[in-house]
Design a protein with these regions (language model features):
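Conserved, well-structured ligand/cofactor-binding cores
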Residues: 1-149
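Short "domain-exit" segments at the C-terminal end of structured domains
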Residues: 150-154
């Protein structure tokens, strides 16, 4: 994988999913599920970050979900506010280089959804004063509490 626009310090964080653990470069806002998608789907070799309008649309969906979850009492207001701020940053064009999964992938957009969830959750963690990957404070799954990936990208 070559993400030359992201400078690497050599520092990593350890993340895990149901398939096991993986070292993630500390500079990446995406996490283990995005890394697995990048490794597994080399179909078009065109990454999500070539389509900033899609990233902005995903940010709109995620922001709306965070607001609804906050209003329904499903998401802590401080976490929701950090997610909302992270989504506003995405709509302003920040962190586009972090959307690295292939535009064509298996499934129903799950990799796209998780790439967005991980980037937004990790930025929200920073806004809350935590380190990327400290998911006990804001987990990527918090961004999909009342929606699933299929409606975001068939």
């Amino acid at each position: 994988m070559d993400f030359t626009e992201i400078r690497l310090s050599g520092k990593t964080r350890r993340e895990h999913d149901l398939l096991g653990e993986m070292e993630i470069p500390a500079e990446y806002y995406f996490g283990v599920q995005t890394m697995r998608a990048v490794e597994n789907f080399h179909i078009s070799r065109v990454r999500l970050n070539f389509f900033p309008e899609l990233i902005r649309a995903l940010a709109d969906v995620k922001q709306g979900a965070a607001m609804a979850n906050r209003d329904l009492g499903l998401l802590d207001p401080a976490i929701a506010d950090a997610i909302i701020r992270a989504c506003e940053e995405l709509r302003a064009g920040k962190l586009e280089e972090q959307f690295v999964v292939d535009m064509v992938q298996g499934g129903a957009g799950t990799s796209t959804n998780m790439n967005a969830n991980e980037v937004i959750a990790n930025r929200a963690l920073e806004l809350l004063g935590h380190e990327k990957g400290e998911y006990q404070f804001c987990h990527p799954n918090n961004l999909s509490l009342i929606h699933i990936s299929e409606p975001t990208r068939p």
